[in-house]
């Protein structure tokens, strides 16, 4: 069973097995990865019946959508360098009924992923609780690996953050402080260590449209947001990828691209179930949301594929 779980536990000791600086520091040419968000097993029925505060007692739809995503990604040629799931893996909050089974069923669906494609997990509010505690963070790490860490892919430095600490760290101030010390260290390293690009992955967006927008459930509080943007720009961060909104959104600000991707699972707007294809070239990050049906039937868009040549 331990070996069976290892695919979900590669993020350890604040790094990621197989995607370390020693192994992946050098630029090796254009590549792409897949960003997915919010499979959130259990939300679709809960949203339909207006009972989102419960854990969601049915999730067959989300399981099938996750399997469709996995099958479509497995068929892509060339293969993506990794898949990152940007939080809200299941709907049931820590300690809620159905949570254990939702996690099991999501893992079963994800086990179909080509073993050559690493799975990177980001923690969301439904994974940790809106106000995380040491216990809920420990539970997440037990199931999915570290809640924050860095990794390298082909000369690109990637930072996975626990954005719930930015939202409400009142239940775990010491963990928040450790995260802050680590993040500052990583951002300083980004300045001092040559990399082709620096990318950030977190669940909650910095902003949905513009950095000066009003505070909202779906973005980070303005003071925190502005401070992070300043730090990210100083460190040369090119793009921040998130989910949480269950709609596509985002915008560029002074060279920083805030990318908000809609969900594999429940849609709260006019988008459809999908994932984002992200192409990394020597000078640019180019990305486009693909519906699961499109990805299944036609694969990634040809103009994106040509960028890999």
From Swiss-Prot:
EC number(s) recorded for this UniProt protein: 3.1.3.16
Residues annotated for a divalent metal cation 2 binding in this entry: 88, 125, 244
Chief location bin: cytoplasm
Molecular function per GO: metal ion binding; protein serine/threonine phosphatase activity
Cofactor binding remark: Binds 2 divalent metal cations.
Keyword annotations: Cytoplasm, Hydrolase, Metal-binding
Cofactor list: a divalent metal cation
Binding, a divalent metal cation 1: 51, 88
Subcellular location: Cytoplasm
Class in the EC hierarchy, top level: hydrolase
Catalytic reactions of this protein: O-phospho-L-seryl-[protein] + H2O = L-seryl-[protein] + phosphate; O-phospho-L-threonyl-[protein] + H2O = L-threonyl-[protein] + phosphate
GO annotations of cellular component type: cytoplasm
Taxonomic superkingdom: Eukaryota
Record region (Catalytic): 47-250
InterPro entries named in the record: Calcineurin-like_PHP_ApaH, Metallo-depent_PP-like, MPP_CSTP1, STPP_CPPED1
Family according to the record: Belongs to the metallophosphoesterase superfamily. CPPED1 family.
Role summary: Protein phosphatase involved in the dephosphorylation of AKT kinase family.
Protein name, as recorded: Serine/threonine-protein phosphatase CPPED1
Gene name, Swiss-Prot/TrEMBL: cpped1
